[in-house]
Amino acid sequence: MKKDILYNLALFFSFIILLGTSNGQLIPRNSDKPEYRDFTSANGKTIKALLIDKTEDTLTLKLPNGKSATLSCEKLSIEDQEYVRKWDKEKELFLTQCKTLTIRELLEIRGYESFKFTIKGNHIFVEGELNGNKSQFMIDTGAGSTVLHIEAAKEKGCKVGPLDQVIFGIGGEAPAALTEVPEIRLGQAFIKDQVLLSADMFKDIPNARKEYDAILGAEFMSKMRAVISYKEGRIFFRPDLIDNDDEIEVPDVPKYRFFKTKDRKTFKGKIAKKNATSIELAIEGQNKNLTLPLGRLTDEDQKYATDWSPQREIFLRQCRGLTVQDILELRKYQSFEYKRLGNHIFVDGKLNKKDTRFMIDTGAGSSVLDVNWAKDTGCEVGPMDQVVYGIGGQAPAAITQVPSLTMGNAKFENRQLLSVDLFKRLGRGLKAYGAIFGADFMRETDAVITYREQKVFLQTD
């Protein structure tokens, strides 16, 4: 087989030259409480009220005495017409009634399947299956493609070809083999019949623990519409949307559902209220509610009832138009649109007040600077007497004092990082980016990465 040089980023490397910029913008938020305000009519009269609904031509106001009134938008002052135009009912409901819901709850309500991940040395690991065999995977947004550890690939039933391919990592190049992979699975999320690369992931790494069987790269994350949440310690997938370009953000939800009991009775209704031991069902077509002990329900319906809350119900049925981006920005996250080329994701920021492009890399336990860019931006770079390890072996590195690194409102000051020659093979004139934004800073800012919306979110306050 002809030897090909495959420029896969394995943990740290990209050869893409990017143009253009992307800047994060904070979205103005409403008050977290119902906003009673003075509305002024076109003839100058004022009334204190709460905006609760609107159509294209009318608005509905709730008055302090509890009554409501509907009037034409044209009867308001120009300023108040503009307020009504910008007002968003779904966002208002979310802010006032759904803010106690966690990111996990909000995404699972939206149909995402979630997996708890563990963090070791700032790396993210999840459990899954490789050809039906229990396996450990490292989540690496910096890896353009999924790569298997060659020993695990052989042990778990993959067909491994000759080592006639080459991949590149922080330590240089390493031989790799084209590998036929019947299946990689995490819960309901899976890929089948793929040809991927295998390599000795731990070669020349001292005391390597061989803690994982494969790196799940950006192409897998993109296919599964992944959301990675450091605060929740979870990764979320939408396996139902694989290969579906005409995707629906939120599946339709019927007004009523079937509740089944352990004595094989079925009731069609919806939860009206609940307490610690029972639920009260509003039965379809009946005026009287039915009370059922939780212990009488099937295990599946017990879980549904236990998870149910009025806030979840409001969000599911009345906030359907909100995107994941809307939800996170309303939760005080700052968003950054990233550039995604070659499966890698990049965001713009500043290193010592100089514009810098960062690669977002969950596989990098610590943020790393390109040594030449670090010098160009005024960082204090020490001697190259440190060593970093990765695919391809080891590479020299320098302890570097960083006065400031900023991304939007996220600011990291007086930090000590490592600098490495990230582009040694390309020459100094060919730089794809100036630094790697690693898991250390992402944990510090409770980062969320969304592949569907191509956004990175940081919580800066």
Where are the regions that the model predicts?
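Cleaved targeting-peptide boundary
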Residues: N23-Y36
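Pepsin/retropepsin-fold aspartyl endopeptidases
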Residues: L26, E74-D461
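Basic/aromatic-rich interaction segments and small domains that mediate binding to polyanionic partners
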Residues: D57-S68, I279-N289
